[in-house]
Amino acid sequence: MRKYEIMYIIRPDIEEEAQTALIERFNTILTDNGAEIDKVDEKGKRRLAYEINDYRDGYYVIINFRGSEEAINEFDRLAKFNDDIIRHMAIKDEQ
């Protein structure tokens, strides 16, 4: 299994309970597809470098995990259809 890092930004006007549920849901998507989560780092609300979908701020979440491409592909597929996630990106951790 390779190491990966996923960073995603949640829209800032979502309720805190819904935000927590969203983070748990996407963590579960990874683990259900065979990934082992090492660390979930919630960076909090930050200003975006540029406006995305009329939002100037966003709630940043970074997940470090070990897993396969299938886990990333499923995360990517579901994140694209979720209106609460305004941007996401996955990279391979070379460490």
UniProtKB/Swiss-Prot annotation:
Membrane-spanning residues: none
One cellular-component annotation, GO: cytoplasm
Keyword Ribosomal protein in record: yes
Cell membrane found in the keyword field: no
Keyword tags: Ribonucleoprotein, Ribosomal protein, RNA-binding, rRNA-binding
Alphabetical list of InterPro entries matching this protein: Ribosomal_bS6, Ribosomal_bS6_CS, Ribosomal_bS6_sf, Ribosomal_S6_plastid/chlpt, Transl_elong_EF1B/ribsomal_bS6
GO-annotated molecular function: small ribosomal subunit rRNA binding; structural constituent of ribosome
Gene Ontology BP terms: translation
Cited Pfam families: Ribosomal_S6 (PF01250)
Family in the record: Belongs to the bacterial ribosomal protein bS6 family.
The protein's role, per its UniProt record: Binds together with bS18 to 16S ribosomal RNA.
UniProt name for this protein: Small ribosomal subunit protein bS6
The species this protein was found in: Oceanobacillus iheyensis (strain DSM 14371 / CIP 107618 / JCM 11309 / KCTC 3954 / HTE831)
Gene expressing this chain: rpsF
